[in-house]
Design a protein with these regions (language model features):
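Conserved GNAT acetyl-CoA-binding A-motif
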Residues: 108-121
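Conserved G/P- and acidic residue-centered "switch" motifs that form tight phosphate/ATP-binding loops
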Residues: 95-97
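Short glycine-aromatic motifs
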Residues: 58, 132-133
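Short, P/G- and charge-enriched loop/turn segments at secondary-structure junctions
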Residues: 48-51, 139-143
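C-terminal "cap" of GNAT-fold acetyltransferases
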Residues: 118-125, 131, 141-159
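A secondary-structure capping/hinge motif
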Residues: 135-137
């Protein structure tokens, strides 16, 4: 099977609804073996909001295959914190997440960051380890919407 061509670009305001739906599909599919139904419901029950739309518009990067949005990710270039890395379930395992992580790491290096960090969902930690991240301790991610989820804080030193 031929590997699909993945293109990356900065998100636009019009991409926000698609990014929101992709996020929810990725969570419900990818996290279903590591989180309870109640946790998944809390995680995905929020409404599409102006705040999310603004975050996508100003911070998200998108991965596309054949002009279809199949992945998201963002990095805070002041803190090195990576967030919102989500991949469409039907293309998981086809290099989309890896390509997004390389892109975000390139941005971090260009900004002069010494390290990058993220809070990995329990199911995603093995993937991030393959990308050079370290961390094994389970912690709690505190959602701004008032609930918490187990996660694994991870860090990667950039050389």
């Amino acid at each position: 099977m031929q590997t699909p061509t993945i293109t990356l670009r900065k998100a636009r305001r019009a991409d926000a609804p698609a990014a929101f739906e992709l996020r929810n599909r990725a969570i419900l599919h990818g996290c279903r073996h590591d989180y309870t139904a109640e946790q998944l419901q809390l995680w995905t029950s929020g409404e599409f909001s102006e705040k999310f739309e603004n975050t996508v518009t100003h911070h998200f990067h998108l991965a596309e295959i054949a002009a279809r949005i199949v992945g998201t990710g963002m990095i805070n270039l002041h803190t090195g914190m990576i967030d919102a890395v989500f991949v469409e379930p039907d293309v998981m395992g086809q290099g989309v997440g890896k390509r997004m992580m390389r892109h975000l790491e390139t941005l971090a290096r260009a900004a002069g960051l010494a390290e990058i960090r993220l809070d990995a969902s329990l199911n995603a930690a093995p993937f991030y380890r393959t990308q050079g991240f370290e961390g094994d301790e389970i912690s709690l991610y505190q959602s701004p919407r008032g609930f918490s989820l187990p996660c694994i804080p991870m860090v990667k030193t950039l050389s």
